[in-house]
Amino acid sequence: MPQLTNGAKALLLANIAVFLLGLLAERTGFEIDKNLGLFYIKSEYFKPLQFITYMFVHAGFMHLFFNMFALVQFGSMIESVWGTKRFVFYYLVTGVGAGVIHIIVTHLQLMPFLDAVDAFFANPTPDALVALGTSTPVFKDAAIMELADRWRTGFYTDEQIIEAFEQQIPQAKAMLFNTPVVGASGAVFGLLLAFGLMFPNLKLQLLFIPIGIPAKYFVILYGIAELFFGIKDFSGDNIAHFAHLGGMLVGFLLILYWQRNGRRYE
């Protein structure tokens, strides 16, 4: 374990403090994730400041532990080369960038649903209902298909279907819009990317894995895994994979910018 540097220590303490305050706030009914977590831009809970605050909020102790372990493990070595100001700047920028990319990807994923909603209410037909139902996992395909078939046969009237979905669509939007992303993972993945570039051949001795893996290979494999799970929409794990990739991407672009402007690693 590397010696804890000043910037990494400050970030570590800030994350722990917010976590403890969140536990205390729960007793008063204050939901820290609803106030500091990052929401989709069309959510009623969205605030621009959440692009910064979300990275200091964690979903639980293990979420906090693994992010802070990585912060200390990778961040201290990076800070010892870059210095505190540059290190903290990089951490915050990659965290914000990860949040921005997460929101962009979320918007792209929700566009088919939002377009299908508009199309359905503009021209409510059984086919438009099927398109609406298959545009989001909120609605079960089999149930929508059965509902559309009954509508076609006259079992339900146009007015009944429209009235039902006028009530269900706001609920579906709330479910899709009002799930916040929290955690320092985006910034941590930015640190991981920087570590792999700065110390490519240094072998990482990971928890639960007794074999050392060169940092450059670990970063590549981890990035590929995140891309795979993100593309496959592996939402069952409740992990914002594209936020992780966003932290790596923003970190890479920032380091590339520094290199081209005469600021090397050392």
Task: Describe the residue ranges of each PLM region.
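A detector for small-residue-rich transmembrane helices and their helix-helix packing motifs
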Residues: 1-266
